[in-house]
């Protein structure tokens, strides 16, 4: 058995400022990450941790200067970090979910800042997976949707997402349960919990109807940046990237013909631990 004794999480937005043409991690984003990892390095030292598992995902994977950034991480913090493939990222997200949610057949998505991983699971086995390089941060930057957006802009983003998803040929033809991982999906769940006065402060395995998700997306996209910052349940620091992220989730749910969305509070980080502790 294992026991969780401490956890810490920080949103860095490593992909911020990285364009499809330049594909460079900006100095500002790198510095934010290095500052955060310096704190984690101190925690590792104080707690006398012997084994450290550290991986870098889409932002570093897609960046031309990703490898040199990881050298900086190693030199300044001592943390050895490995870039993982989109396939490995999908596998670890699945491990985080499969160990903590009892569901046999489902569609799983993990929406991050620079990519979304989608997996089709049958009888608790991943039969298809894909990593698509569109995330809440990169889409926001691509369409400049961080502040006010009009209906034309929303429809342009939707068409772009639909076009990307149309290339995934193995989407289930029959409706399947859909499980979501990531900060955007957790925020949508928090907004829903506040709206229905949900009595528990628990997001993991929280389930709500897709009609409510779509209603939330309509509400979010209809508000100004300042108004979004005041939405009950939405982290104010996510108010600028929530539109792009919410539209990705909406289009995945539509394509999957889903009736409900289930939230997993466990994802890649937990999957990394389970893969080490109990490989499947």
Residue spans for each PLM region:
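Conserved strand-helix element at the start of the C-terminal RecA-like helicase core
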Residues: 50
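Dinucleotide-binding Rossmann-like beta1-alpha1 core, especially the glycine-rich loop
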Residues: 54
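A generic, well-ordered mixed alpha/beta core segment in the N-terminal half of proteins
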Residues: 105-119
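Beta-strand initiation motifs
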Residues: 1-5, 125-127
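Helical "lid/coupling" subdomains associated with nucleotide-phosphate turnover
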Residues: 13, 17-47, 57-105, 120-123, ...
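A structural signal for short, well-ordered beta-strand segments
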Residues: 8-12
């Amino acid at each position: 058995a294992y026991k969780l004794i401490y956890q810490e999480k920080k949103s860095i937005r490593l992909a911020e400022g990285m364009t499809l043409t330049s594909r460079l991690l900006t100095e500002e984003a790198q510095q934010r990450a290095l500052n955060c990892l310096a704190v984690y390095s101190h925690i590792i030292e104080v707690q006398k941790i012997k084994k450290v598992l550290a991986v870098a995902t889409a932002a570093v994977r897609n960046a031309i200067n990703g490898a040199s950034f990881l050298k900086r991480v190693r030199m300044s913090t001592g943390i050895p970090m490995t870039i993982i493939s989109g396939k490995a990222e999908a596998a670890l997200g699945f491990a985080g979910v499969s160990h903590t949610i009892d569901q046999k057949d489902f569609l799983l998505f993990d929406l991050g800042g620079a990519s979304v991983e989608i997996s089709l699971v049958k009888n608790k086995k991943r039969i298809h997976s894909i990593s698509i390089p569109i995330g809440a941060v990169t889409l926001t930057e691509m369409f400049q949707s961080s502040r006010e957006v009009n209906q034309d802009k929303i429809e342009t983003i939707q068409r772009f997402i639909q076009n990307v998803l149309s290339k995934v040929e193995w989407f289930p033809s029959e409706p399947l349960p859909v499980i979501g991982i990531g900060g955007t999906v957790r925020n949508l769940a928090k907004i829903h919990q506040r709206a229905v006065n949900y009595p528990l402060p628990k997001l993991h395995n929280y389930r709500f109807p897709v009609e409510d998700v779509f209603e939330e997306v309509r509400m979010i996209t209809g508000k100004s940046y300042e108004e979004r910052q005041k939405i009950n349940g939405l982290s104010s620091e996510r108010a600028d990237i929530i539109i792009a992220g919410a539209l990705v989730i909406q289009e995945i749910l539509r394509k999957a013909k889903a009736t409900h969305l289930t939230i997993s509070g466990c994802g890649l980080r937990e999957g990394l631990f389970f893969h080490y502790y109990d490989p499947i």
